[in-house]
Amino acid sequence: MLEQVILFTILMGFLISVLLSPILIPFLRRLKFGQSIREEGPKSHQKKSGTPTMGGVMIILSIIVTTIVMTQKFSEISPEMVLLLFVTLGYGLLGFLDDYIKVVMKRNLGLTSKQKLIGQIIIAVVFYAVYHYYNFATDIRIPGTDLSFDLGWAYFILVLFMLVGGSNAVNLTDGLDGLLSGTAAIAFGAFAILAWNQSQYDVAIFSVAVVGAVLGFLVFNAHPAKVFMGDTGSLALGGAIVTIAILTKLEILLVIIGGVFVIETLSVILQVISFKTTGKRIFKMSPLHHHYELVGWSEWRVVVTFWAAGLLLAVLGIYIEVWL
């Protein structure tokens, strides 16, 4: 029965995304919600200018509808599911506002860094308030062991850092056709397996709903992309995967399973530090995926390589938690 629920969930998420896309993409095009491309980016990306963005709306709709329908068939909506849906929708709305300012108000940078940070913090604080209300654990566990450490009030700081940092890390990865869609499907798939292994079936259902939604989106987002998810999708996915890691007490393992997102973020941090301290850049461009483009790799080769890296890291994460 449970296996059937998981199968139907991923199929439903996939089909909703696939069926919504042919409706939403022309609608976004008519509204002229096209992506503007930074001039300092790779020259090969200039031809993507005008590609409909904010496609993350179809991902979020697919996740919400699929999760609610399948959860009600399996059990009642749990506090964990409420938190997952809240964070996904909250960060998705923040990303939508950022995208709207970029494409409609023609402010290419969207929300200022300060405005976006304030929004991310507010959502994280509300999340933790609800998390604390339901008396969820404030300990952090060492993957593959029974060792755990209660952080007490300091767990709030960790949650804040993870949600803000994690959503931004996933957002940075969304720079090539299909890159984030593929790596997200792999990472959420890994967490679905681990949540299932812990008998957290509601979290597993949510996770596979995301897998189905992003795979359906990937049909139209693979190179050459017909639509981009925008910050609407990337911030929502970032918030969602961090929330899953918190609810499954796999905060540390997120660094491995989400290793591609971590590496992308580190490449930006190292680039900034190097340039400010030495005046030299480590990479031709950051995040890292742009560096490989500029050394001559095709966009598709970069994407597939990062997918492969994400898959290896996901398998490693599962191995550490389940079999080590």
From Swiss-Prot:
Xref: InterPro entries: Glycosyl_transferase_4, PNAcMuramoyl-5peptid_Trfase, PNAcMuramoyl-5peptid_Trfase_CS
Taxonomic superkingdom: Bacteria
Membrane topology term: Multi-pass membrane protein
Catalytic activity: UDP-N-acetyl-alpha-D-muramoyl-L-alanyl-gamma-D-glutamyl-meso-2,6-diaminopimeloyl-D-alanyl-D-alanine + di-trans,octa-cis-undecaprenyl phosphate = di-trans,octa-cis-undecaprenyl diphospho-N-acetyl-alpha-D-muramoyl-L-alanyl-D-glutamyl-meso-2,6-diaminopimeloyl-D-alanyl-D-alanine + UMP
GO molecular function, one term: UDP-N-acetylmuramoyl-L-alanyl-D-glutamyl-meso-2,6-diaminopimelyl-D-alanyl-D-alanine:undecaprenyl-phosphate transferase activity
Principal place of residence: membrane
Cofactor(s) the protein requires to work: Mg(2+)
Pathway the protein contributes to: Cell wall biogenesis; peptidoglycan biosynthesis
Keyword Cell membrane: yes
Residue ranges of the TM segments: 5-25, 50-70, 77-97, 117-137, 147-167, 176-196, 203-223, 227-247, 250-270, 302-322
Organism of provenance: Bacillus subtilis (strain 168)
Name of the protein described by the UniProt record: Phospho-N-acetylmuramoyl-pentapeptide-transferase
